[in-house]
Amino acid sequence: VEKNNLSKLNFNNPDNIVGTVDMPTECGTVIRKGKSYSQNAEIIDLLHAAGAIVMGKTATSELAYLGPSKTTNPHDYSRTPGGSSSGSAASVASLMAPLSIGSQTGGSVIRPASYCGVVGYKPSYGLISRNGVLRTSNTLDHIGMFGRTVEDVPLLAKVLIKKDNYDPATVYYSAENILNETKKGPLFEPKFIFYKTDHWKIIDKKS
């Protein structure tokens, strides 16, 4: 991936979130079948301006919530890719695209990234515009992204992190050095925590 632009890079974005003029935005539900927008979401325009090619929409959980999407895990078709940005993570894991867009209110970027074995990045609140994006929670919704490497993801973040007057939650932040920041290592010593949820007693041994 070139350092200064996204020229001719293929991208996918999840059907649930990103409004587009040239493709339907159905939010993973039949009640919005064929629904299209009169203008692109802000992040789509930023991608186009950077030279990216948006290849298509990926499957998502219905209304970006709990129901499973049509997508399966590319490493094991019998398993889930995680949600709600399931298709976005799976498309990167299956080499359909080098980078992909996702959204997160709870764990909808970091979960499918973990399940599919790709890099998931959920920037801090207010760094990326949600203008033209399906809202689940105004105070919790984030735009995130998926990539194959830690080095690739900041190149996309650098393009999308912009102040947008149509999303009052966004703030000005210079992302010029974001790639260098990823090379510095963690600010604190990482800790690994293993937590048994209430579902632990019913999970199968293979899982």
How should each PLM-predicted stretch be described?
Residues 1-106:
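Gly/Ser-rich catalytic/binding loops embedded in alpha/beta enzyme cores
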Residues 2, 92-93, 111, 120-122, ...:
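Short beta-strand-to-turn element immediately C-terminal to the catalytic PLP-Schiff-base lysine
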Residues 20, 62-64, 107-110, 142, ...:
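Flexible loop/turn segments at secondary-structure boundaries
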Residues 23-25, 65-68, 110-115, 132-133, ...:
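Short acidic, glycine/serine/threonine-rich loops at helix termini
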Residues 35-36, 78-82, 110, 134-136, ...:
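Short Gly/Pro-enriched turn/cap motifs at secondary-structure boundaries
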Residues 48, 89-93, 116, 122, ...:
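Predominant activation on well-ordered alpha-helical scaffold segments within soluble catalytic domains
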Residues 105-131:
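Glycine/threonine-rich beta-strand-loop-alpha-helix active-site module
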Residues 122-206:
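A short helix-breaking turn/cap at a secondary-structure junction
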